[in-house]
Amino acid sequence: MIVIKIIMNVIPGKHLEMMQTLLSMIEPTAKEAGCISYGIFCDIEDKNHFCLLQEWETREYLDHHIASHRFGILLGTKALLREPLEIQIHTVSHSEGIDAIHGARKKQTKMSPIDRQRNLIE
């Protein structure tokens, strides 16, 4: 799986324009071949900070999306930004769910207080 994270720092007063652009992209992008998920997040402390997270089945699907007109629209929002887009692409080779959380928490509760302290130090 490939995850692309895009951070946007929008010029004050351009928040709604950016939001409309991003919202218009959700449905068509989510329907693209290989798109697992597409989410837009807004910082609760600063409405001018957005994070766009997309998950793709393969790098080929992501590359096809990056070459699309729709992604070009996103790149064209630079006039709305205080600074350039921050883009990170991650290749995920393994992922775990809630069972991993439960397992880790069980493991911690079985440790003695001394072992837990040592574990934090290491």
Where are these regions (language model features)?
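Glycine-rich beta-strand-turn "strand-cap" elements at beta-sheet edges
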Residues: F41-D46, L75-E122
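Short, surface-exposed ligand-recognition loops at beta-strand->loop->(often short) alpha-helix junctions
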Residues: N9-E17
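Short, well-ordered beta-strand segments in beta-rich or mixed alpha/beta enzyme
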Residues: I2-M8, G39-I66, A104
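An amphipathic, aromatic/His-enriched active-site/gating alpha helix that lines ligand/cofactor pockets
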Residues: S24, A30-I36, E55-I89
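Short, flexible segments with low predicted structural confidence
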Residues: M1-I2, L16-E17, A33-C35
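Short alpha-helical
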Residues: G13, K47, H69
